Swiss-Prot record:
Oligomeric and partner information: Homodimer.
Organism of this sequence: Latilactobacillus sakei subsp. sakei (strain 23K)
Record-given protein name: Beta-ketoacyl-[acyl-carrier-protein] synthase III
Record-level GO BP terms: fatty acid biosynthetic process
Gene designation per UniProt: fabH
Chain positions covered by the region annotation ACP-binding: 254-258
Length: 326
């Protein structure tokens, strides 16, 4: 069964932190950040957690579509910064939304999370009466070492998502997908390490959980992104029976403007096909692709019938590609 995307929505913290703001807390400059990443500012949450942002997205999707909460079959949240280890962020959203009949779960695939969540959602849109909320949301700021300019300047908080409906018509959105995991390189990007520090059996007192800051081997991730991701996009498009020239928009993970520019060049496609909004939001991980999609739809840059490649890549290491006709 394929799906149709019937609505998009996003939610962002109100607090804007510019590159100049960061110079007050770390040794950096606007020029240093912008020249290396393309980022000018990002949203940093002051009070909202991941579930709060995702709930705003879910409610907006319902409001825009006119679909009743009782019609929602499933809620899938892609995040690497959940409120808790358990319950899932999706379960919190389900409860606060009042979607009592819906089942809910999280997917953790870092910056590929939204594309993996779309893949999972396909199994639950079996009839036109099936509606599924798929949301990517992150509050990465709570996991950052704000003294480390190599990582702290890159990220921002936010959430965005889509409302899917099952369809048997020729108006379906889904065309093809390609998911890749390279677990042998999983140590290149890690966050929230929870080691077994001591046996817990028989111990009195609260269990100790080790939380570590977000850490990334920048050079290795960049090489992975340029070495593997363009080839994966090319292969996914070919496997779908399409050519790169037929793709109207490449919505790739908003990690770095120089990286995206290089990808466009490697695929021999015009940069105009690779929209960017990272200058305003930074790297929002699982929220990155749906945030860009929602913005492009809202501004009428993406229209019904446009052929789009959604490509996430990052921790895992993972690559997730969904080819859709919006």
């Amino acid at each position: 069964m394929a799906f149709k995307i019937i609505e998009t929505a996003s939610a962002l913290p109100a607090n804007i932190v510019t590159n100049d703001d960061l110079t007050a807390i770390m040794e950096t400059s606007n020029e240093w950040i912008e020249s290396r990443t393309g980022i000018l500012e990002r949203r940093i949450s002051e009070t909202e957690n991941t579930s709060d942002l995702c709930l705003r997205v879910a409610q907006t999707l319902l409001d825009k579509s006119g679909i009743a909460v009782s019609q929602i079959k499933a809620i899938i949240v892609a995040t690497m910064t959940p409120d808790y280890y358990t319950p899932s962020t999706a379960a919190i959203v389900q409860g606060r939304l009042g979607a009592d009949q819906a089942f809910a779960f999280d997917i953790s695939a870092a910056c590929s999370g939204f594309t993996y969540a779309l893949s999972a959602a396909r199994g639950y849109v079996q009839t036109p009466d099936d509606y599924v909320l798929v949301i990517g949301g992150e509050v990465i700021s709570k996991m950052l070492d704000w003294s480390d300019r190599s990582t702290a300047v890159l990220f921002g908080d936010g959430a965005a998502g889509v409302l899917l409906q099952g369809t048997t018509s020729d108006q379906e959105s889904w065309v093809s997908e390609k998911l890749i995991t390279i677990g042998t390189e999983s140590d290149q990007l890690v966050s929230g390490y929870a080691p077994v520090k001591r046996p817990n059996f028989g111990q009195v007192g609260q269990t100790q959980v080790g939380i570590d800051f977000f850490k990334m081997t920048g050079k290795a991730i960049y090489q992975f992104s340029t070495r593997r991701v363009p080839k994966a996009i090319e292969a996914a498009v070919l496997e779908a029976g399409l050519t790169l020239d037929q793709i109207d928009h490449f919505l790739v993970h908003q990690a770095n403007s120089r990286l995206i520019t290089k990808m466009a060049s490697m695929l021999d496609q015009p940069l105009t096909k690779f929209p960017m909004n990272l200058q305003h939001y930074g790297n929002t991980s699982a929220a990155s692709i749906p945030l860009l999609l929602a913005e492009q739809v809202e501004t009428n840059q993406i229209k019904r019938g446009d052929l789009c490649v959604l490509c996430g890549f990052g921790g895992g290491l993972t690559i997730g590609i969904q080819i859709i006709r919006y």
